[in-house]
């Protein structure tokens, strides 16, 4: 190593010389050997001297030997290369000879290597091999398999076989795979007794033959052949899986009533879906890559779970209706169809087929199903919410002002009475009679509708009959409080109708269907809802037929909706404030008028019950005795409790300094209004028509004696019953009864953050004629105090017997005190 490190060039030269060839290496070895021999032959001279002649002869001899050895090495190398070429040629010739000798005939050695599955024979008497796999062996002749009678599974796929007659010798064969061969016919062998699965795909079969002898066949695969017609399967009574993909079939027929569960007919030339009517067990259907343009023919397959219609010509969304009623359809593939270009395709298909879990090879999310339902068939609650949102947004286009239906009291929303029930159940007649009897309190509010008037109906009396164009224009302008659709006709409650009634100081009495009630419940109005429903559906149906205004379909819908109203009343207690049986209109109006009288405080005692009389059927509406006895009391008293709860929640919540300052200004404005002071100039911008102001704690001012006298005269008219005025008992009690409505005490007035001026009812300061009404004022003051004591006693007694949580029912505020 040291020598190489000192002289690296010498080391490199040595490596180079060693790599030159075998001849030069041999020459170097001979040269070293010659040197040693010469040293032993000639004695060494002293001082290292040699004779010149001897040196020359030795050099020539070495050169001669080197050249000779070099020629010998080159000759040996040429001989070796020649031998290698000859060996390669011999190997190629041997391989060619072997190929020439292999003729595709199956031999014992090959079978021995491919046979597996040691088990018992069909008779169970001996152990044999049951499975043989000879796939992709380039076999042509398999006649040797005639001796393998115990085989149960035979795989011959990927060969060049043209004849399967040897299968006739396999009586116990269960499965046969002869795909990817050169068969031109199928089943040209004696049928094994229990043959179940056969695969003849990717052959040259062009025609199907009678397979009546193969009654045990359960699976038949004939893909990628040249079959044009399905025949010979009528008696395969056990066939459950049939695949004929990749053929030339144009019409589906010949399947009869087979128990097929899986059917594949993809990559054919089918244009219409026919011949599947009797396949009642069909579960999986593959008709992809055909020319189908309609889904007609897939109806009435109750067990169908998977449908593959990829790459066809389905265009219209209406085609989905043919598979809409398939109860357990889970997977549908409509990829590469013109129907996919429809903008509503995805959600429409999901809505029509809500049971789907996979569409076009994509999992369907729950959110997509909810969106689809809300888009195409939303629940009634969603419709009501959308309707309310539409009107709120559209109303922003109208000039913003304080509505006439906005009462000055924080705890008294505008009073409304809603009668609801099925079509032509009598709610409109009840509303008209009620408004005629209590004309100083109620006015009928007519809705707008796009339907034509029935016989006997008057425009602006029963409805405002308008065209669809006018209705849409009013809707876009935000003039409706609510709208709903019933019987393919639109109905709407116009805000101007309510404001016109409120401007005259009256409460609104309106009738509508349940859809309108749902929408109205989302608005800021809080009316009283009274359900008018016929209990005897047969009598109700006969009444509709006698009217002669409705078709048979409309009558059936109206009668069926009776159960809907009853179901809502039972499922949502408190949804309606009262229920009235509409089988007899006279009895129904008697109950309704009693209810309104108690509500207005026009009778001495409250009605004991709102339940129908003993001769009226009440099987649809069942309630407990306690609820029947207390229904009137709750109907009358729960208003104050409900609104006091709402008001107290608002007043007791923690408020910011800005909110407290705003409330202070509101209370100050209310106090000044009650004291009769003129508001500031800027408040005149929000003036409106005269609206009755409910009396609070019996406080009311009169400017002159004429106003007080007019009030007395008006009260005489208000409290007259149809049969006359109430009997007089005493002066104080008479005054108390006649003016109890005017001096109705607000139960939470003492808890409000402002105090009303003392003195009860008195003439306005500075007004003339105050001495003339002292007697009347004293009497009214006595009546007011008595009324307050009685009301306080009733409240205390009601609180003592009240169940916990019963004060949270949504009810309406007191109705205002008549026309001013």
UniProtKB/Swiss-Prot annotation:
The keyword Cell cycle does not apply. Its main location: cytoplasm. InterPro entries: GK/Ca_channel_bsu, Guanylate_kin-like_dom, Leu-rich_rpt, LRR_dom_sf, P-loop_NTPase. CDD domains: GMPK (cd00071). One of its GO terms (molecular function) is ATP binding. Residues 337-375 form the LRRCT domain. One of its GO terms (biological process) is axoneme assembly. PROSITE patterns: GUANYLATE_KINASE_2 (PS50052), LRR (PS51450). It is found in: Cytoplasmic vesicle, Secretory vesicle, Acrosome; Cytoplasm, Cytoskeleton; Cytoplasm, Cytoskeleton, Cilium basal body. LRR repeats lie at residues 129-149, 150-171, 172-193, 194-215, 216-237, 238-259, 260-280, 281-302, 303-324. The keyword Cytoplasm applies. It comes from the Eukaryota. Residues 72-83 have a biased composition (Basic and acidic residues). Residues 72-96, 800-820 are annotated as: Disordered. Involved in multiple aspects of sperm assembly including acrosome attachment, shaping of the sperm head and in the early aspects of axoneme development. Not essential for primary cilium biogenesis. PANTHER family: GUANYLATE KINASE-RELATED, LEUCINE-RICH REPEAT AND GUANYLATE KINASE DOMAIN-CONTAINING PROTEIN. This is Leucine-rich repeat and guanylate kinase domain-containing protein. The gene is Lrguk.
């Amino acid at each position: 190593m040291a020598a190489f490190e000192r002289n690296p060039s010498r080391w490199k030269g040595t490596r180079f010389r060693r790599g030159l060839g075998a001849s030069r290496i041999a020459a170097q070895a001979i040269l070293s050997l010659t040197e040693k021999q010469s040293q032993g032959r000639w004695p060494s001279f002293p001082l290292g001297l040699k004779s010149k002649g001897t040196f020359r002869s030795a050099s020539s001899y070495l050169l001669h030997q080197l050249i000779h050895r070099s020629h010998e090495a080159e000759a040996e190398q040429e001989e070796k290369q020649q031998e290698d070429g000859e060996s390669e040629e011999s190997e190629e010739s041997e391989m060619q000879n072997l190929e020439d000798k292999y003729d595709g005939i199956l031999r014992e050695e090959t079978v021995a290597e491919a046979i597996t599955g040691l088990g018992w024979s069909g008779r169970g008497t001996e152990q044999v091999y049951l499975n043989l796999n000879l796939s992709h062996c380039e076999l042509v002749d398999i006649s040797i398999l005639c001796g393998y009678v115990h085989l149960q599974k035979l795989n011959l796929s990927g060969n060049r076989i043209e004849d399967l007659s040897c299968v006739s010798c396999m009586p116990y064969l269960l499965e046969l795979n002869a795909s990817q061969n050169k068969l031109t016919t199928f089943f040209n062998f004696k049928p094994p007794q229990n043959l179940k699965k056969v695969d003849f795909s990717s052959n040259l079969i062009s025609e199907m033959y009678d397979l009546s002898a193969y009654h045990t066949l359960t699976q038949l695969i004939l893909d990628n052949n040249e079959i044009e017609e399905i025949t010979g399967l009528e008696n395969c009574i056990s066939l459950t899986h049939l695949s004929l993909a990749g053929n030339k079939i144009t019409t589906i027929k010949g399947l009869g009533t087979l128990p097929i569960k899986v059917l594949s007919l993809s990559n054919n030339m089918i244009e219409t879906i026919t011949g599947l009517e009797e396949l009642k067990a069909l579960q999986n259907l593959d008709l992809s890559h055909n020319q189908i343009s309609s889904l007609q023919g897939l109806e009435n397959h109750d067990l169908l779970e998977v449908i593959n219609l990829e790459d066809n010509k389905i265009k219209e969304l209406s085609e989905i209706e043919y598979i809409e009623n398939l109860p357990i359809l889970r997977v549908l593939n409509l990829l590469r169809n013109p129907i996919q270009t429809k903008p509503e395709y995805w959600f429409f298909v999901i809505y029509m087929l809500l049971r789907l879990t996979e569409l076009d090879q994509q999992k369907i999310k729950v959110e997509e199903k909810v969106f689809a339902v809300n888009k195409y068939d939303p629940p009634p609650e969603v419709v009501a919410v959308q309707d309310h949102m539409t009107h709120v947004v559209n109303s922003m286009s109208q000039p913003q002002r304080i509505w006439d239906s906005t009462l000055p009291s924080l705890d008294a929303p505008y009073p409304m009475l809603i009668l609801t029930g099925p079509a032509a159940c009598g709610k409109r007649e009840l509303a008209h009679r009620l408004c005629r009897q209590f004309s100083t309190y109620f006015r009928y509010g007519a809705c707008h509708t796009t339907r034509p008037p029935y016989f006997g109906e008057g425009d602006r009396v029963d409805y405002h009959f308008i065209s669809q164009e006018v209705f849409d224009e009013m809707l876009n302008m935000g003039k409706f409080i609510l709208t709903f659709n019933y019987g393919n006709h639109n109905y709407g409650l116009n805000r101007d109708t309510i404001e016109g009634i409120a401007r005259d100081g009256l409460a609104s009495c309106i009738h509508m269907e349940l859809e309108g009630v749902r929408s109205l419940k989302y608005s800021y109005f809080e009316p009283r809802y009274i359900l008018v429903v016929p209990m005897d559906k047969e009598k109700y149906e006969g009444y509709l037929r006698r009217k002669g205004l409705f078709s048979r379909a409309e009558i059936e819908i109206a009668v069926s909706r009776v159960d809907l109203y009853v179901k809502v009343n039972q499922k949502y207690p408190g949804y309606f404030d009262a229920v009235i049986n509409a089988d007899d209109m006279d009895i129904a109006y008697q109950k309704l008028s009693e209810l309104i009288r108690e509500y207005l405080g026009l009778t001495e005692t409250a009605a004991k019950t709102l339940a129908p009389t003993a001769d009226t059927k009440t099987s649809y509406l069942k309630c407990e005795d306690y609820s029947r006895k207390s229904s009137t009391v709750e109907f009358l008293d729960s208003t104050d409790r409900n609104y006091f709860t709402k008001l107290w929640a608002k007043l007791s919540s923690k408020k910011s300094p800005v909110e407290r300052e705003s409330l202070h200004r509101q209370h100050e404005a209310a106090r000044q209004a009650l004291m009769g002071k003129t508001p500031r100039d800027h408040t005149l911008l929000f003036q409106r028509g005269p609206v009755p102001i409910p009396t609070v704690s019996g406080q009311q001012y009169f400017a002159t004696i004429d106003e007080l006298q007019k009030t007395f005269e008006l009260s005489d008219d208000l409290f007259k019953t149809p049969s006359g005025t109430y009997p007089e008992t005493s002066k104080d009690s008479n005054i108390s009864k006649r003016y109890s409505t005017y001096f109705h005490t607000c139960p939470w007035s003492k808890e409000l953050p402002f105090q009303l001026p003392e003195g009860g009812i008195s003439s306005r300061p500075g007004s003339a004629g105050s001495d003339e009404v002292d007697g009347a004022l004293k009497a009214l003051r006595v009546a007011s105090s008595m009324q307050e004591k009685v009301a306080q006693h009733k409240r205390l007694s009601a609180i003592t017997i009240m169940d916990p949580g019963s004060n949270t029912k949504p009810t309406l505020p007191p109705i205002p005190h008549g026309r001013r």
